[in-house]
Curated annotation (Swiss-Prot):
HAMAP family: EFP
UniProt family annotation: Belongs to the elongation factor P family.
GO terms under biological process: peptide biosynthetic process
CDD domains: S1_EF-P_repeat_1, S1_EF-P_repeat_2
Entry-linked InterPro entries: Elong-fact-P_C, NA-bd_OB-fold, Rib_uL2_dom2, Transl_elong_fac_P/YeiP, Transl_elong_KOW-like, Transl_elong_p-like_YeiP, Transl_elong_P/YeiP_cen, Transl_elong_P/YeiP_CS
Domain of life: Bacteria
Protein name as it appears in the record: Elongation factor P-like protein
SUPFAM superfamilies linked: Nucleic acid-binding proteins (SSF50249), Translation proteins SH3-like domain (SSF50104)
Molecular functions (GO terms): translation elongation factor activity
A single Gene Ontology CC term: cytoplasm
């Protein structure tokens, strides 16, 4: 079993008999000599959807739970449920909107490279690709000749996500966004 320092986002861990899917990890180092790093795992209980937070010292053993990854593509929305289809056998996986609210900011009909994370055959969450292409819906007018400056402006993308983009980017442009950092990477070709 891995130590707390080896746990990554997307791992499923056992917390008091409950399966918790790790969505975010925060590492803190207490002051003073000999202070061990403390890992704070944030996620949600797979069975109930309740948000959970747990802390472990770096060298503590954490019980992980096996997960399965299946390549999926977005299919359609039904109320507050988002339906994704397996790329191989066309099995449908249904996700509640609250469980994948952060991931929805990066998903449109064209998003490729997504994976459904399954725990005991049940869809728990989505794993996004490292970057996605999205269209800018609204931003300030572009400034010609601004490619040399490093100044940025806010831009609202087609999914509702707002990122900082260079001044030369205009409404309607397609841009590449890093899903982990939620940052503009470059203009899509």
């Amino acid at each position: 079993m891995p130590r707390a320092s080896e746990i990554k986002k997307g791992f499923a861990i056992n917390v008091d008999g409950k399966t918790v899917l790790v969505k975010d990890i925060e590492v803190t180092t207490p002051g003073g000599r000999g202070g061990q790093k403390i890992y704070r795992f944030r996620g949600h209980d797979v069975a109930t959807g309740v948000k959970t937070e747990v802390r472990h010292k770096a060298d503590e053993i954490v019980e992980t739970i096996d997960v399965t990854k299946r390549a999926v593509m977005f299919s359609y929305v039904d109320g507050n449920e988002y339906i994704f289809m397996d790329n191989e056998d066309y099995t449908q996986f249904i996700f509640n909107g609250e469980m994948i609210e952060d991931e929805l900011l990066f998903i449109n009909e064209d998003t490729q490279g997504m994976y459904a994370i399954l725990i005991d055959g049940t869809a728990a969450t989505l794993e996004l690709p490292t970057s996605v292409e999205l269209v800018i819906e609204e931003t300030d007018p572009s400034i010609k000749g601004a490619s040399a400056s490093a100044r940025t402006k806010p831009a609202r993308l087609s999914t509702g996500l707002t990122v900082q983009v260079p001044e030369y980017i205009a409404t309607g442009d397609k841009v590449v966004v890093n899903t982990a950092e939620r940052k503009y990477m470059n203009r899509a070709s």
